UniProtKB/Swiss-Prot annotation:
Keywords: Aminoacyl-tRNA synthetase, ATP-binding, Cytoplasm, Ligase, Metal-binding, Nucleotide-binding, Protein biosynthesis, RNA-binding, tRNA-binding, Zinc. This is Alanine--tRNA ligase. Zn(2+) binds at residues 564, 568, 665, 669. CDD domains: AlaRS_core (cd00673). InterPro entries: aa-tRNA-synth_II/BPL/LPL, Ala-tRNA-lgiase_IIc, Ala-tRNA-ligase_IIc_anticod-bd, Ala-tRNA-synth_IIc_core, Ala-tRNA-synth_IIc_N, Ala-tRNA_ligase, Ala_tRNA_ligase_euk/bac, DHHA1_dom. Catalyzes the attachment of alanine to tRNA(Ala) in a two-step reaction: alanine is first activated by ATP to form Ala-AMP and then transferred to the acceptor end of tRNA(Ala). Also edits incorrectly charged Ser-tRNA(Ala) and Gly-tRNA(Ala) via its editing domain. Its EC number is 6.1.1.7. The keyword Zinc-finger does not apply. Belongs to the class-II aminoacyl-tRNA synthetase family. It is an enzyme of class 6 (ligase). GO terms for molecular function: alanine-tRNA ligase activity; aminoacyl-tRNA deacylase activity; ATP binding; tRNA binding; zinc ion binding. Signal peptide: none annotated. Its main location: cytoplasm.
Length: 874
């Protein structure tokens, strides 16, 4: 039974039991910012279990895409070297939200395993929590599992309820016992049953975990029964497939074998047991689906994890002798394996391929030199009988050649060596310190300051007359004097300048007296309550102790305040229009615009955007006062003030009431909502799976935007010789004309193809009574290629044909074989023979197949090989 069939049977079985099939959620959790990646089926239902996300169903089933390659759940180092470690895996699960409980969950599992999948009952063992007599009795008395194959697992992790068979969501909250189902591979495989000293062997393999959310645990550790008891189960598709396909390694199942063969093809390796092929086959799944879900290779967070996985795959290809890019060529193979189950993968195929190709090209620019240095260093260490690579060298590889430490450690591990990571960390710390001292300041953090805190007057004033300099910094070092032309950071005892925080940019302005002028380009925090003014001394000298007038750029501040206050109103409006699930995930407020990232799973419609704009502008017209109060945090939240995820708040907080909005905020704002003037959303898009971004403008910027838009509408109307009010109708007419012209063009192409077909027929070569033709048809589209192939088949009577066309760097291929020849020459195999050489893959019927490719430079050679390929099969 193939993996695809196993997945389908699972979902269909639970659908027949009244479950709703729910699509896999994104690998980027939209409801749990504490998670790096979705790593289990229950992640998308966490809020459902907690009762904060009501759904129209009480039973659900999923095949959930999952990744474990960062943070707590990090299997990366073991991937490719063990039978069951993966970065990406599929978790099959069924869920009950206050519906059925232990009886049905256990009976469903047993029926599916023994009846649908037809696993031998005597091969299945189960574990239960030591105190869960209910589950034990269901297994023993109702299901009929012999008691010698039911194992009670106690508190084996050092504390009460700390057990492999007791699940918790956290220190407090929902929790409960679980029961696990194991498959016995038989006495020929080493290992003992769960709970025995030999349980880590491969004989008994856990295939399904059934979690019973039965209790709520409070802060004192007291357990009370939940009013709605729920079920969360998880079964790894790859593990189940290994059992059903009678193999002992997940890498031996059909899905992985096909990917391993594809990896062998692109790396030109014949040994399918090579661990590096397993690494590559695993990593193409994780990388492709992460990119599908909006993760892009980068230097931090999820992007960095993705980059690590990509580079590890590339390094294993390099190890196999592949010195050029190859990894991106596997995307088409993955789509062939998983594109039906996950159509989003097929839809994003080209984007995934492009991202991986770019990352490969970028890394291959550095890997060859870095690898030669690393291999030479390892040889030196081995020659001296050592086992540890110098951390300074590892840092050089990282700093100079972009070689990640984990990749260096991976190479060392294969040679039985380690990296001196403390020495690496020391070198990294020194480099950061040097960069901080040598570079121009972007931030004031890291400056050594031991004086008094800065008193901030910016909520009430735009200038302060008697501000005294208490510290000066040039190039990261404390100085007593700054000279004309120098960049510096100035710390004052009093200031009206707002330091960048909470998404609002820092103020600009001037520090001056009769002899001195310092232009402030940015304001940042040196410490939590110490403000640094970063800029350039344009006139005179500055000394510690000097007294200055500190004056902000009032016009810039006013525009920034308008945008910040509008952000609060927009946040509230988004929650009203889209739902209470909308949470701020990031923001940037400056004088030009407000940029707001928030949790939401779908693009906003035009109607939703208009409604948000209308709500905000109605609040602006109401001209409500901005009321600021300082109060204890708990009191503020209890009073309905919104606290933003990721922000840090002290015991005392600043609460802003502006119209219908109430938020905790330390930023600067308008006095009344009417001061915002006018609000307009100009951009809405996605920045990651489950995260949307809105950019909006206010005041004079918004008015200017509408005026420019109006001017463009008038220009477009003039170009189409219509009034602005007639634009929609006129555009529809133009579109109809274009369609008509395209139809005429298609007819002309068809005629051209027919005439070219007559010429091409004369190029066909007869082999064993079959005419063979492989040629390029200039300017043809896929439809024209198909029509030409059909006409050639009719003309030649007995033929095997491949026609190609190239447009915008992409290759289109069509293969056609007449019925008499298709018994020996399959069109699908023929087109794949050519496609694989031009960076693609395809398929179809024995008589007609199509494919694409991304490497047109290889097309002439690929077509030249068709004659020999066909000749071998006739």
């Amino acid at each position: 039974m193939k993996a695809a069939e196993i997945r389908e049977k699972f979902l269909k079985f639970f659908e027949s039991k009244g479950h709703t099939i729910v699509r896999s959620s994104s690998l980027v959790p939209g409801n749990d910012p504490t998670l790096m990646f979705t790593n289990s089926g229950m992640v998308q239902f966490k809020d459902v279990f907690l009762g904060t996300d009501p759904r129209p169903y009480s039973r659900a089933t999923t095949a959930q895409r999952s990744v474990r390659a960062g943070g707590k759940h990090n299997d990366l180092e073991n991937v490719g070297y063990t039978a069951r470690h993966h970065t990406f895996f599929e978790m099959l699960g069924n869920f009950s939200f206050g519906d059925y409980f232990k009886h049905d969950a256990i009976k469903f599992a047993w029926e599916l395993l023994t009846t649908v999948y037809q696993l031998p009952k005597d091969k299945l063992w189960v574990t239960v929590y030591q105190e869960d007599d209910e589950a034990y009795d269901i297994w023993a008395k109702e299901v009929g599992v012999p008691t010698e194959r039911i194992i009670r697992i106690g508190d084996n992790k050092g504390a009460r309820y700390a057990s492999d068979n007791f699940w918790t969501m956290g220190d407090t909250g929902p929790c409960g016992p679980c029961t696990e189902i194991f498959y016995d591979h038989g006495p020929d495989v080493w290992g003992g049953p769960p709970g025995s000293p030999e349980e880590d062997g491969d004989r008994y393999i856990e295939i399904w975990n059934l979690v019973f959310m039965q209790f709520n645990r409070d802060a004192q550790g007291n357990m009370t029964r939940l009013p709605k008891q729920s079920v969360d189960t998880g079964m790894g598709l790859e593990r189940l497939a290994a059992v059903l396909q009678h193999v002992h390694s997940n890498y031996e199942i059909d899905l992985f074998q096909n990917l391993i063969k594809a990896a062998a093809r692109v790396t030109e390796i014949s040994d399918l047991t090579n661990n590096s092929l397993k690494v590559i086959a695993d990593h193409i799944r994780a990388c492709s689906f992460l990119i599908v879900d909006g993760v892009i290779p980068g230097n931090e967070g999820r992007g960095y994890v993705l980059r690590r996985i990509v580079r590890r795959a590339i390094r294993h290809g390099y190890k196999l002798g592949r010195k050029g890019s190859f990894f991106h060529k596997l995307v088409a193979d993955l789509v062939a394996e998983m594109g039906v189950a996950y159509p989003e993968l097929k839809e994003a195929e080209q984007r995934v391929t492009d991202v991986l190709r770019q990352e490969e090209e970028r890394f291959f620019e550095t890997i060859e030199h870095g690898m030669s240095i690393l291999e030479g260093a390892l040889a030196d260490v081995e020659a001296k009988g050592g086992k540890v690579l110098d951390g300074e060298l590892a840092f050089k590889l990282h700093d100079t050649y972009g070689f990640p430490l984990d990749l260096t450690a991976d190479v060392c591990r294969e040679r039985g060596m380690t990296v001196d990571e403390p020495a690496f960390d020391d070198a990294m710390a020194r480099q950061r310190e040097q960069a901080r001292a040598a570079g121009k300041f972007k931030a004031a953090q890291g400056l050594e300051y031991t004086g008094a805190k800065t008193t901030f007057h910016g909520y009430e004033e735009i200038a302060f007359d008697d501000a005294k300099i208490v510290a000066l910094y040039v190039d990261g070092s404390s100085v007593n004097e700054v000279k004309t032309g120098q960049d510096a950071v100035v710390v004052l005892d009093h200031t009206p300048f707002y330091a960048e925080s909470g998404g609002q940019v820092g103020d600009q302005g001037v520090l001056a007296n009769a002899a001195t002028r310092f232009a402030v380009a940015d304001t940042l925090k040196v410490q939590a309550d110490v403000i640094g003014h970063h800029g350039t001394l344009e006139q005179g000298t500055l000394k510690v102790g000097d007294v200055l007038r500190a004056e902000i750029d009032a016009h810039r501040r006013a525009r920034t305040q308008r945008n910040h206050s509008a952000t609060h109103l927009m946040h509230k409006a988004l929650r009203e229009v889209l739902g209470a699930h909308v949470q701020q995930k990031g923001s940037l407020v400056d004088a030009e615009k407000t940029r707001f990232d928030f949790a939401h799973n779908a693009p906003m419609t035009d109607d939703e955007i208009r409604r948000v704009e209308q709500i905000v502008n109605n609040e602006i017209l109401a001209n409500a006062p901005g009321i600021v109060r300082v109060m204890p945090y708990d009191e503020a939240v209890k009073g309905g003030a919104m606290a933003l995820f990721g922000e840090k708040y002290g015991d005392e907080v600043r609460v802003l009431d502006l119209g219908f909005s109430r938020e905790l905020c330390g930023g600067t704002h308008v006095s009344r909502s009417g001061d915002i003037g006018f609000f307009k959303i100009v951009v809405e898009g996605g920045v990651a799976a489950g995260i949307r971004r809105v950019e909006a403008i206010t005041g004079d910027n918004a008015v200017r935007y509408v005026q420019e838009l109006d001017a463009r509408v008038n220009e477009a109307a003039a170009a189409l010789k219509a009034q602005p009010s007639e634009l929609t109708q006129r555009i529809a007419q133009v579109q109809d004309q274009v369609k008509s012209l395209e139809k005429e063009l298609g007819a002309l192409k068809s005629k051209l193809a027919s005439s070219q077909g007559d010429e091409l027929a004369q190029q066909a070569v007869e082999i064993g009574g079959v005419f063979v033709l492989a040629a390029t048809l200039d300017g043809a589209d896929a439809k024209t290629l198909r029509e030409t192939v059909d006409k050639l088949k009719d003309k030649l009577k007995s033929a095997a044909i491949v026609l190609a066309a190239v447009e915008s760097g992409k290759v289109s291929l069509i293969a056609g074989v007449t019925p008499d020849a298709s018994k020996k020459v399959k069109a699908g195999e023929l087109v794949n023979f050519v496609a694989q050489q031009v960076g693609g893959k395809g398929g179809g019927r024995p008589d007609m197949a199509q494919a694409g490719g991304t490497e047109p430079a290889n097309l002439p050679g690929a077509l030249a090989g068709v004659k020999g390929w066909v000749e071998e099969r006739l």
